[in-house]
């Protein structure tokens, strides 16, 4: 189901709780909402649709990928980026890394470890920040 975009900075600044198998329906809501905003959005976190759970979705070279409980375990190649967000007006500068290694659970709640680089890595960092209550 397409959900409205949360814009309340107090809600968005809260840390999200770990996701469980009971939160699988949130992943579908994220898919539907990301698809509805595909012209101006490449990733979302569950708190952006009002669910304070550690779930993100992002465009991974044309395919939507969902991660439950993502954590960056390694990063390298710091740089300054300028980013926008559906939940906040305008753009802001922030520190990002060119390469990240992420541990997460897939939609079967199997633990995975994968390295991402470039723009995809930047998207993932932005969405994991949302899960941690960090707003750009």
Language model features: what each stretch is:
Residues 1-136:
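Positively charged
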